[in-house]
Amino acid sequence: MDEKRNDPEVLLRVEHLCQYFKSKGHVNRAVDDVNFEIHKGEVFGLVGESGCGKTTTGRSIIKLYDITSGNIWFKGQRICAGTQSYVDRMSACRKKTADAVRALKRESAADPAKKAANDAKIASLEAELKASLAADREEIRAARYDHKHSDREYADKLVADVKAEYLPRLEAAKGTPGEAALQKEYRDRLRVAKKTKLITQIQMIFQDPVASLNPRMTVREIISEGLVINGIKDQAYIDEKVYEILELVGLVREHAGRYPHEFSGGQKQRVGIARAVIMNPELLIADEPVSALDVSIQAQVINLLNELRAKLNLTILFIAHDLSVVKYFSDRIGVMYYGKMVELATSDELFAHPLHPYTKSLLSAIPLPDPHLEKQRTRVIYNAIADHDYSTDLPSLREVAPGHFVRCNDAEEKRYRKELGL
């Protein structure tokens, strides 16, 4: 792992993330080569129209999908690794070598004098292929190991931390009245540490507050489910944590015995938020948490997330399609279009100097509260075929200004830099 991946300020790093789905012989590239990083304590907004791949990106990060290729690093440790890119590279390498060998054999058949030299070239090509395939197989093995065992390594670290904390205290408490209580506390902490998974440090708030809650479970059972799964059996402790979290999200402890159908949409979303934050996560993925709510309730939920961010030191990946909401809540914003990241910048920079035509189109669609200004608002219609010429020069995500990335080719990069006066 390189030094960059160990940067303590970077909580999550997504590298070349691809998430493809196959259906009836067709491959749907839902997320295609997406790169970004999220720093500790910030809100990173991910925006785009419906179907652009933003929700799939969030679900891939939390391992609800097995990613096709790419890497996802969390707290300096690889938690997701796809292998399809290595498989494709191995296939391409085999084909290239086979074509070269066939060409050399045809040349040797046509001119026997070149046979000895060509045989040496063939042996060299086959040796190179063997070395390349061995390297790719090792990459695949390492990727599969990290994908499967990242939780085990994290649990081992937690167990070591618990032992380092409690063993000296237990030694000092030998023969004292408090020894039994300390032993019990140590065993409980050790049991929880052994069952803790790194992925539990990432929690998700789902878009639909109705569908994401089990109608047969009480609010107490819904919120405490994560604690129970992680081995906590002390019912008094669980109840106290549930009551504490309910009050934190603006509900009361009497709500703990009720069922989801007894709540309004905003209250259900608060229950969903409580379920996520009771696990004390470091990263919260909020998948359009306000899109199904009324405007007045949206403001309440956004304010609640802001309060929780400050109180619990949360880092938030905020997925939305409403740029007016994202603007006031996010520190940085990434814009997605058809599975690609087309622009990434700070919130202020993106709204002040949008560069990609699709970003300009999204911003022009935001309605203005002043009716006179609304009448003068000009819509920008994005047409990918007309707005770009990628016939010879293909685009990539480039840093056209410090911290401002745009998907463009060489000609567009020069134009964007000129727009910014660089």
Predicted segments with their positions:
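Short catalytic/signature loops enriched in Gly
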Residues: D2-L11, V27, A81-V87, E107-S108, ...
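The feature captures the beta-strand-to-loop junction immediately N-terminal to the Walker
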Residues: V47-G48
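Conserved ABC transporter NBD signature motif
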Residues: G70-A81, V162-Y166, E171-A173, G178-Y186
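Conserved ABC ATPase "signature" region
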Residues: Y237-E254
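Conserved ABC ATPase signature
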Residues: Y259-F263, Q267
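A short, proline-enriched helix->beta-strand linker immediately N-terminal to the Walker B motif
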Residues: I278-E282, Q298
